[in-house]
Amino acid sequence: MESAPGAETIIGGKRRLYFAGTSYFGLHGHADLIRAGVKAFQKYGTHSATSRAGFGNNPVLLEVEEQLKEFFGETDAAYFGSGYLSSLVLAQSLAEKYDAVFVDEAAHFCIADSAHSLGKPVYRFRHRDAGDLRRKLQTKLKPRQTPFLMTDGVFPTYGYIAPVPDYLDVITPYKGLIGLDDAHGVGVLGPNGRGTYEHFGVASEGLHLAGTLSKAFGGHGGFIVGGKKLIAGARTTAGAYIGSTPTPTPIAAAAAKGIEILRSHPEMRDRLRKNVSLVKAGLKKLGVPIDDTPVPIVAWSTGSAEKMKKVQRLLMNRGIAIAYLKYIGAPSEGVLRVTVFSTHTVEHISRLLKELATAL
């Protein structure tokens, strides 16, 4: 890749239509984000070179947290150097409130790594299976223990959404907690872009949200949002927050601008949803199995790794980049994966579908 990711991206020296990655709103190359980053670079240098527990705070990092509070309608937020740390910071912040951890078997690496670092029993349940979660709670949880469920909000390979309302029904009798790493849901799902919880319209004191600014928002770094007590816990007890260097200040400045833009322009989500509907309808006509949700991810397997690699090469030669990957939740032969952006035009989408019809 030799340009910012967007609907048209330079790859291998050629401008191609880009239907991969996670720049759902094309903000990574947005002029306002770049200007904000350059201005911060000139004033603050590369980064604070120390933890936020020391002298690492600066007005830019605090502005990101203010923007997060406004975007998610929460009373406080904690922002740190990597989205990979989000689940860990959340789990460490809540550590005194649960006794055992239950993890979706297809959870992202960062969730699994976090769960196994906590020093508490960890149990895996079948992918997106509330019934199996119930059985695991019944057989593994000891009397008077509180469970903590850790899962993706939107799973990265296929874009499937975790059945949060079902999980809430199952875990509430145990007074359990849910920690949702909504990396692919925030900014995208829900009327205000607040993610999977808002998509389902669920709310509970036991629901907790972690996410990243590296996808929809065009920036970088992880975050958790919630009440004052939760965030105070992150700042005083979460080693992953206390002991890490914050996001480089220029990138944080760009992230703050990205949050502001996405909050101020809900029509960007409207365009994304229209494009998602257009792509999914077209792929369905080609016989591709479709999960009919607003998630801008479609992945499928033809059953043959060689065939899928060939399809990817054919499209690349025709000036269109889609992904072939072996990732979490994918079968052994891998999948073809298409990602949709709000910045794709009808012409871009028509060309993608036309070339796929020939290649498949």
Regions of interest found by a model, annotated:
Residues 90-109:
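Conserved PLP-anchoring active-site segment centered on the Schiff-base-forming lysine
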Residues 245-265, 271, 275, 284:
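Structural motif of enzymes handling amino- and sulfur-group chemistry
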Residues 35, 39-82:
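Conserved N-terminal alpha-helix of the aminotransferase class I/II PLP-enzyme fold
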Residues 1-46, 176:
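N-terminal "arm"/small-domain region of PLP-dependent enzymes with the aminotransferase-like
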Residues 198-233:
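Active-site PLP attachment segment
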Residues 123, 127-180:
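Active-site phosphate-binding strand-loop segment of PLP-dependent enzymes
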Residues 31, 35-39, 43, 66, ...:
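PLP-dependent enzyme catalytic core of the Aspartate aminotransferase-like
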Residues 27, 270-277, 284-319, 334, ...:
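Conserved PLP-binding catalytic core of the aspartate aminotransferase-like
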